[in-house]
Amino acid sequence: KHERRKQIDKLCKIHCIFLPVVVCFYTQSQQALLLPKRRTEMSKKKKSGKKTALKVIGIILAVVVVFVGVYAALMAWTPAATTYSGEINPYITADAALVSAHRSGGGIMPENTMLAFESCMNSKDFNTDIFEFDLHITKDNKLILLHDDTLDRTTNAVEYFGYEDVKPIDHTYAELRELNFGENFQAEDGSYPYRGLRGDKIPDDLRAVLLEDVLDKLESHGKYSYIIEIKDGGENGMRGVDILYDVLKERGLLDRVIFGTFKGEVTEYVDEKHPDMLRSAGVSEVLKFYGAALLNLNLDEDSFKYDALQIPANQYRVVRLGTKKIVDYAHRYNIAVQYWTINDPDEIERLNDIGADAIISDTPDIAYKIIKE
């Protein structure tokens, strides 16, 4: 029995290696087949290019066939996963999925601005259960809300500072407060209602938002849960985690925040320095979970260091995470499943029906109507 378990674990690891390879080959082959036609002087290379594309497709099919064969064989004798017997994860919902405002509801108002938070908080048409937002550290060690690595897309930073790729780490919080964070927000009618606002004409709720300020604002209004992602990696990311931890602990919010990051070194730092923080699975952990779920492996209750999967429903048409099998397997191990970024009404309804615990959407108003009503 022990040897059988070891063999299963090895095959699971092999699958987790093959899966990214399949995705990579598939993506590259799609790009190769969709490339524009070469000019006349490149015509001699067309035939060899087609042959290469066919070879790539052949490799993909071969890998898939091998995986399917292994999977089918294992499913015949792999033991079923056990059921978690400890304290129930509060983020696992018994009925409908929770509604999470992605980037504070960036499809309704300018993302990650106080105006967006206020729009969700004060709405009489829908309620928000979870606020999702992203953080970057500034030059003076403040945490501000921003999704991208630079301020170029959402603000007038390029115009104001005179160069491109403006990053928060290169400027103080006071300097970033001079920017218009609603500059490039496009309303549903196609207009840009906040474009061109400068200086004193920029309202306070369209300026850079400090972590402490948004938490205090929300907590004064009601009791919410939060999904907070640190975007920085390396030392900046670790320093950002320390600041975030202190802010949350001071306000008694550690149990209402699920922390996330795409940086492996930051995940390891959280596990080592702040093990009492709730967190979502990292990229490699999601791949391992996916392999274990497909094989229905029987794992120990303490096999997972994370409390939630924050994942897309489908990735590259190959990795299908938005299935009832994935949700049920996660729930067996007391792991909540929260899907991003889901804006399509039909997909919202489908994921809610399979038991998703949260729908993270740019349009929480639409998600609420579908899920709650």
Regions found by a protein language model. Give the residues of each.
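Extreme N-terminal basic, low-complexity initiation segments
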Residues: 1-12
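Leucine-biased recognition of intrinsically disordered, low-complexity hydrophobic segments
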Residues: 11, 19, 33-35
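N-terminal Lys/Arg-rich, disordered targeting/topogenic segments
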Residues: 23-52
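Phosphate-group recognition and catalysis centered on beta-loop-alpha active-site segments
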Residues: 43-373
